[in-house]
């Protein structure tokens, strides 16, 4: 089975019971879980001091265990504080041989983008310990797609997407929309041309989602892509004031401005049902009336 190494570079794990349940679930399945002490750390709202959380990341360069999955405990906020002090060069060098399979999402997007920007390091945007593996019930779809991505050099995700018929390919990248916005103009924002940009978010009203997407558009980032895929935007329920304005309104407005396909409906993000995507891998997108396919390759996988 697999070895999981936990890291907690972001928010304090307020759901300790869920973290313990996630660890138990993984060990019951025959996996080994290391570095479990990080789940109890706390400094204000963070999972430890800056020094402790930074060491979670920088110590990965010295990790010698083979075939290791690095799993973020949870998101929240905190990764942005660490970006300037991460030893990117050491992490990039470490990933050039026997790469760690680094997985997380939400606030962790900042770390993932930094690794991609600094050294084309591929990481996995997917489930985390508390919200997913520690849920009351582990979602079967999420579990299946996690192992699908980590065990197969080439794999395909299928869904019923909304958007124009298209077939294109490029570097798959993205993650949490708000975190990408926070990286614009910094050394940790990947400079991807002709890519396939995939985005998700949580607790953002539709107008805020639109505003962030427009910022990516006006910054020239969206027009430089081959396609955009939108995942889930949890907690984005409109109110009476919106008078019918919703996420579909956002999508329609963006499509009226973009000359590239925008495909929606992917189960990707903060919901219990989510795929796992290797950010920085090669992807082929095919959208027809029959459905949508995303075939991904070129990412590191577990050695079976």
Swiss-Prot record:
Transmembrane segments: none
Cellular component aspect of the GO annotation: cytoplasm
Active-site positions on this chain: 106 (nucleophile), 200 (charge relay system), 270 (charge relay system)
Location of this chain's protein in the cell: Cytoplasm
GN (gene name): ldcA
Organism: Escherichia coli O6:H1 (strain CFT073 / ATCC 700928 / UPEC)
Protein name (Swiss-Prot/TrEMBL): Murein tetrapeptide carboxypeptidase
Function: Releases the terminal D-alanine residue from the cytoplasmic tetrapeptide recycling product L-Ala-gamma-D-Glu-meso-Dap-D-Ala. Can also cleave D-Ala from murein derivatives containing the tetrapeptide, i.e. MurNAc-tetrapeptide, UDP-MurNAc-tetrapeptide, GlcNAc-MurNAc-tetrapeptide, and GlcNAc-anhMurNAc-tetrapeptide. Does not act on murein sacculi or cross-linked muropeptides. The tripeptides produced by the LcdA reaction can then be reused as peptidoglycan building blocks; LcdA is thereby involved in murein recycling.
Entry's Gene Ontology BP terms: cell wall organization; peptidoglycan biosynthetic process; peptidoglycan turnover; proteolysis; regulation of cell shape
Annotated catalysed reactions: N-acetyl-D-glucosaminyl-N-acetylmuramoyl-L-alanyl-meso-2,6-diaminoheptanedioyl-D-alanine + H2O = N-acetyl-D-glucosaminyl-N-acetylmuramoyl-L-alanyl-meso-2,6-diaminoheptanedioate + D-alanine
Family: Belongs to the peptidase S66 family.
Main subcellular location of this protein, as a coarse class: cytoplasm
InterPro entries documented for this protein: Carboxypeptidase_A_C_sf (IPR027461), Class_I_gatase-like (IPR029062), LdcA_N (IPR027478), Peptidase_S66_N (IPR040449), Peptidase_S66C (IPR040921), S66_fam (IPR003507)
